[in-house]
Amino acid sequence: MAHNNLQTIAEREASILAPYAMHSSDTLGRCYDEQQQSYRGPFQRDRDRIVHSAAYRRLSGKMQVFTGDMGDYHRTRLTHTHEVSSIARTLARALRLNEDLVEALALFHDIGHPPFGHAGEDALAKCLETEGGFSHNQYALTIAEQLETRHQHFPGLNLTQEVLAGQATRVDKSAPEISPLLEVQAVEAADSMTYDAHDTDDALKLGLVKFAELEQLDLIKICQQQIASRVDELGEREYQRAIIHTLLDCQVTNVLEHTSTALANFQWDSASAARQSDFRIGTVGEIAKAKKQLEAFLYERVYRHVAIVKTRELAQRQIQQLFAVLVKNPEIMPIRFVEHGEQVGLPRSVGHYIAGMTDRFFEQQFLAHVSR
């Protein structure tokens, strides 16, 4: 039965996917051998394992950029992840890539983020600077390979080599000998487009920037031109919503037009052949230039906003304080992290414990063990 179903999956993918896509039948498999299932392919299983993991559920309690003190409209790591998955699957379907693999990669890409976003990551990197530092991308691999437990005979989620390798490209940003799979590139492009749009949206809603400031940016002007060509008149709220929607749409359109043309010219006959090229899925031309301008604006006017900086500095101080307490008093941690410390060293285990916390649970632990 399992063999027949996998044959069906292979036949379906052969009819739908492009030759340059990663076909499920070509997977390098998992670290630990498992019996194949009759109703799911390997990347479908990866997706489901990620979604059902504790680390994935905790993303709902981790801030993206803005904290819960600023309201409850803005994105969390989980909503960001869902938005990335949505855009990445759109790219995959249009480009005839493996949508199951793309979805698994997208749902997995931010699973290693600690509490309080990049402020938390910077704080843990400081705490662990003599131990090799801290990277949320590397921690995602630690979660998948060590910390999550789903089987009595082996550690981790036992994801496919393709998902693990895709995440590994986020750890080491240096130019690889061979390019990442096109599915990995699609997720990277979707991630970038998504946070540009939703950070702009959240910053507007929270009053950190004014719409008049955004109107000075080239990418917003392009969006305005596109809206004017198809809509006569909109109210203020509807117009701003249309801008955010078009901000995504114009980037997705740019990526698909450029990539579709390039893929037709390359005529790769396999995923391996595509990896021999230095081609990258992403925005190009006027849109790419305008995108960089928007990102520079967000960096200066939003990410370095006094309210955001104040929150970052507080979070970093508190994480460093709790880290110091836990290193001196490891018995505070759950026993499995004490045992984990015997394998990776106590400081690293403390870092892993804190990195797995939601914002709220961190605050509870801080109040209980530091601010008492």
Residue ranges and their predicted role:
Residues 102-129, 137:
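Aspartate-rich (DDxxD/NDxxD/DxxxD) Mg2+/diphosphate-binding motifs
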Residues 1-81, 85-91, 98-99, 134-372:
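Histidine-centered, transition-metal-coordinating active-site segments
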Residues 71-79, 92-93, 108-115, 128-131:
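Short coil/turn segments at secondary-structure boundaries
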